[in-house]
Amino acid sequence: LSNIFCIGEDLATLESSEKKSFLLNQLEAFCKKDVEPDLLDYEPIWAIGTGIEADSENIKSSVSIINDFLEQKKINTSILYGGSVSVENIHEIISIPGIEGCLVGNSSLDGEQFAIIASKITG
């Protein structure tokens, strides 16, 4: 089995400009348990299943925070993105440096949409 560690902020945290410390606290939590994730998923809570998409700048800044942490701790894992992933936004998401895949929620319920998303991810 593979473990996937999911982190992300709620809307109040995003709006309060406390996102970095919030994400770092989540990342530190798994280090305290001496657990190294096989995959790490950045999934802003406010974007899960809501249809509200995170803009690419928000995703980029979060991936940068995560990458800096992983490098500092010498943890080698892939970063995924989840949170209202759709046919409409998949190209933009996978073009963000550091994103190596996606967790697809609601869009995976439609086989045709999911196939389109999967084909864009795998190239």
Q: How would you label these PLM feature ranges?
A:
Residues 1-123:
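Active-site loop-to-helix "anion-binding N-cap" substructures in soluble metabolic enzymes
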